[in-house]
Amino acid sequence: MAAEKIYEPYKKSRGTMIYTPTNQQMSRGGIGEKLADFVKNLYWVYYIHLPFYLMTSLDAFCLHTIFLVVVSLSLFGLLKYIFL
């Protein structure tokens, strides 16, 4: 039950420490949070780690182009499916 409690920042009567909950404490475990975490992890893997540590510039360019084409076509297909 304690994990479901919404934490509010508060100030103790003594001292100047202000309690701030962690992201894990604030998490509700919904589908929106899982999707946001997936996108954030994908960003870190794709944009940060691969181009700088594992690839040459031509490999990074090809992967970047393919990734953007796939994402763009997927988004277009999803929007077309929803609205038509």
UniProtKB/Swiss-Prot annotation:
The keyword Membrane applies. It comes from the Eukaryota. It is a single-pass membrane protein. Its main location: endoplasmic reticulum. The chain crosses the membrane at residues 63-83. GO terms for cellular component: endoplasmic reticulum membrane. It is found in: Endoplasmic reticulum membrane. Keywords: Endoplasmic reticulum, Membrane, Transmembrane, Transmembrane helix. Stimulates the activity of serine palmitoyltransferase (SPT), and thus plays a role in the biosynthesis of sphingolipids. This is Serine palmitoyltransferase-regulating protein TSC3. The gene is TSC3.
